Regions:
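Conserved core segment of the aminotransferase class I/II
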Residues: 1-69, 79-81, 164
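Short, solvent-exposed loop/turn elements at beta->coil junctions and helix N-caps
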Residues: 2-4, 87-88, 131-134
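Short amphipathic alpha-helical segments
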Residues: 12-13, 95-97, 140-143
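Generic structural signal for small/hydrophobic residues in well-ordered secondary structure
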Residues: 15, 51, 71, 99-101, ...
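Conserved glycine-rich beta-strand-loop-beta hairpin in the small C-terminal domain of fold type I
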Residues: 48, 52, 68-82, 90-104, ...
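Surface-exposed helix-capping loop/turn segments at secondary-structure junctions
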Residues: 82-91, 168-174
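PLP-dependent enzyme catalytic core of the Aspartate aminotransferase-like
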Residues: 109-111, 115, 119-128, 134-183
């Protein structure tokens, strides 16, 4: 297990493992893990302290993940707002902490999704991750987390919508100009 998902500490890269049963049966395995952690990994000391605090303190995760909890409300809001943007389709996740919207390639003819995401960041100050960053084969998806509070999500998705509107208009003009030139 780890802190990233259960305790909302993305980036901490701190986790733990429990081995149960007869220790003699797994002694070589444990020795191998210890050797690997000594050779290739470096202990995340602040993260180790965070584990102790997370496991021993108030377990707010139960309130957060309740059927009507904050994460469900934020997921529903992000899903609703993203679905309202023209040319964007999205599946509502049942267990993930993010959406993976698809952009209609006819409305958003993206050639380089890294540049597309960089432009969004530069123009609207919203950071997303391009779909190809998750081995998606086409430049028509991006990932957006719905962990921020509702007000922050509303503002971020409003900015995404503005960026996408400008992108659609810019590329619609190019298509219109090309059609006029052919006539």
């Amino acid at each position: 297990n780890g802190l990233s998902k259960n305790y909302r500490s993305c980036g901490y890269r701190s986790g733990w493992m429990v081995v149960s049963g007869d220790k003699a049966m797994v002694a070589d395995y444990i020795e191998g893990l210890n050797m690997l952690s000594s050779m290739r990994l470096c202990a995340n000391v602040p993260g180790q302290y965070a584990i102790q605090t997370a496991l021993g303190g108030y377990q707010s995760i139960n309130d957060l993940v309740a059927k009507d909890g904050r994460l469900a409300r934020q997921r529903d809001l992000a899903y609703k707002l993203m679905s309202e943007i023209p040319g964007v389709t999205v599946t509502k996740p049942k267990a993930a902490l993010y959406l993976f919207p698809k952009l209609d390639p006819d409305m958003y003819p993206i050639k380089d999704d890294q540049q597309f995401i960089a432009d969004l960041l530069k123009e609207e100050k919203v950071l997303l991750v391009q779909g190809t960053g998750f081995n998606w084969p086409h430049p028509d998806h991006f990932r957006i987390t719905f962990l921020p509070h509702e007000d922050t999500l509303r503002e971020a998705i409003k900015r995404i919508a503005h960026f996408l509107e400008r992108y659609r208009n810019k590329h619609a003009l190019k298509k219109g100009a090309a059609a006029t030139a052919k006539a």
